[in-house]
Amino acid sequence: MKRLLVACCFLSGLISASALADASTDLQNRLSKVNSFHASFSQAVTSSDGAVVQEGEGELWVKRPNLFNWHMTSPDESVLISDGETLWFYNPFVEQATATWLKNATGNTPFMLITRNNPDDWKQYNVKQKGDDFELTPKSASGNLKQFAISVTPSGTIKSFTAVEQDGQRSAYTLKSQQSSVVDASKFTFTPPKGVTLDDQR
């Protein structure tokens, strides 16, 4: 009887590991079906006690694996652009831009996970699936990300994603009007405007 219980536990562990692997593979396969897209988004940031910290909206352009333009239009404008080599962050209000190497950007942030869709990045997470909804938990608790959830259709359309930090703060993004089409290359280039202070960390 004891041997049977041990065998059942072992088999259950194998099935669970297989399910996690299948969920991760399915998520990667779905994301890989759309190589470039444009969408508008809304943002809602809440604290651990549910209080609204910030609400905003903006536009997003992506061309996988390493090109993206994240343009927050409200409440305050900011731009995050990758040209494939350099990651640019621009804040028009304070007239400051920061440049860092994209290769040094961490792969454990939700946005980098979505835009890169790199198998090595996904290996750092346990992935559970329920229909179109995927829940990711970091295998290492050393980072600031506690949990990440994303909803993706079988055709590769991202409907929403949510990041929960270790302190309980939740950032939820809902994508709408997503268009899977070729994005103009100019969306992925950035030149600091005249008068802007550049913090070049490359």
Swiss-Prot record:
One GO-annotated biological process of the protein: lipoprotein transport
Keyword tags: Chaperone, Periplasm, Protein transport, Signal, Transport
Compartment list: Periplasm
UniProt cross-references to CDD domains, sorted A to Z: LolA
This protein's GO CC annotations: outer membrane-bounded periplasmic space
Main location: periplasm
SUPFAM superfamilies: Prokaryotic lipoproteins and lipoprotein localization factors
Region forming the signal peptide: 1-21
Membership in a protein family: Belongs to the LolA family.
HAMAP family in the record: LolA
Protein function: Participates in the translocation of lipoproteins from the inner membrane to the outer membrane. Only forms a complex with a lipoprotein if the residue after the N-terminal Cys is not an aspartate (The Asp acts as a targeting signal to indicate that the lipoprotein should stay in the inner membrane).
Name of the featured protein: Outer-membrane lipoprotein carrier protein
Organism: Yersinia pestis
Lineage: Bacteria, Pseudomonadati, Pseudomonadota, Gammaproteobacteria, Enterobacterales
